[in-house]
Amino acid sequence: MAWVPAESAVEELMPRLLPVEPCDLTEGFDPSVPPRTPQEYLRRVQIEAAQCPDVVVAQIDPKKLKRKQSVNVSLSGCHPAPEGYSPTLQWQQQQVIQFSSVRQSVHKHRNHWKSQQLDSNVTMPKSEDEEGWKKFCLGERLCAEGATGPSTDESPGIDYVQVGFPPLLSIVSRMNQATITSVLEYLSNWFGERDFTPELGRWFYALLACLEKPLLPEAHSLIRQLARRCSEVRLLVGSKDDERVPALNLLICLVSRYFDQRDLADEPS
């Protein structure tokens, strides 16, 4: 086998787009000054290319990398419903029809509700504020660790800061698709480690109603994650008459049958 110079081997992997023949230059050629002729310019390019290393290694500062990194593995399929827990096909079809009507109404009246003045106590968090959105949707009382006792606030009316703001149309109409996806992720993360609550259910329904189709990949992954988590929690519910069962069934139904994730659908009872 003939010996191939290292430079030739590199050129085989990175061929020249414009082959350049050796240039006849004057003895006074100085590569440190601007080129005066096309030949001097091409020769200068050759010299600079020869000085480039064959392999370049990026210097990465580990401190600048995100400390908290996660990988979401998408597993297919929901846990089958326990016997007697699965809704009928007719019930599922009715929910899809009603949900479609809600989505159309939200879309039609979005500009109207977006223009409505929010109450003075409503301050919507920024899109990237995960903790802020959890408190906004679920309330500071539920988000506070160990805070299970009744509120000591004796003022009349409902303290939404403590119990969470409901997904009013005047609120969700102000949320763009990026914010809707972010809040869906924040609440899904919360739900992944905790039980189902009515507050979660209301917000999940409202966010799904505002989620535009076709789904972006991130939203697609999130709603599948939501349906699977609902099926996991349903397995732990002790009675089919528990009020959580129809709410969990509804979310699984909407994800699977409205958003066309049919592999997650419940088999009709």
Swiss-Prot record:
A GO CC term assigned to this protein in UniProt: cytoplasm
Keyword terms of this UniProt record: Cytoplasm, mRNA processing, mRNA splicing, Nucleus, Phosphoprotein
Subunit-structure text: Monomer. Part of the core SMN complex that contains SMN1, GEMIN2/SIP1, DDX20/GEMIN3, GEMIN4, GEMIN5, GEMIN6, GEMIN7, GEMIN8 and STRAP/UNRIP. Part of the SMN-Sm complex that contains SMN1, GEMIN2/SIP1, DDX20/GEMIN3, GEMIN4, GEMIN5, GEMIN6, GEMIN7, GEMIN8, STRAP/UNRIP and the Sm proteins SNRPB, SNRPD1, SNRPD2, SNRPD3, SNRPE, SNRPF and SNRPG. Interacts with GEMIN5; the interaction is direct. Interacts (via C-terminus) with SMN1; the interaction is direct. Interacts with SNRPD1; the interaction is direct. Interacts with SNRPD2; the interaction is direct.
Keyword DNA-binding recorded: no
Residues bearing the modification Phosphoserine: 70, 155
Residues that span the membrane, as ranges: none
GO BP term (any one): spliceosomal complex assembly
Annotated protein name in UniProt: Gem-associated protein 2
Similarity comment text for this entry: Belongs to the gemin-2 family.
Localization terms from the record: Nucleus, Gem; Cytoplasm
Organism, as annotated: Rattus norvegicus (Rat)
Function recorded in the entry: The SMN complex catalyzes the assembly of small nuclear ribonucleoproteins (snRNPs), the building blocks of the spliceosome, and thereby plays an important role in the splicing of cellular pre-mRNAs. Most spliceosomal snRNPs contain a common set of Sm proteins SNRPB, SNRPD1, SNRPD2, SNRPD3, SNRPE, SNRPF and SNRPG that assemble in a heptameric protein ring on the Sm site of the small nuclear RNA to form the core snRNP (Sm core).
Pfam families according to UniProt: SIP1
InterPro entries: GEMIN2, Gemin2/Brr1
UniProt-listed Gene3D superfamilies: 1.20.5.220, 1.20.58.1070
Taxonomic lineage from the root: Eukaryota, Metazoa, Chordata, Craniata, Vertebrata
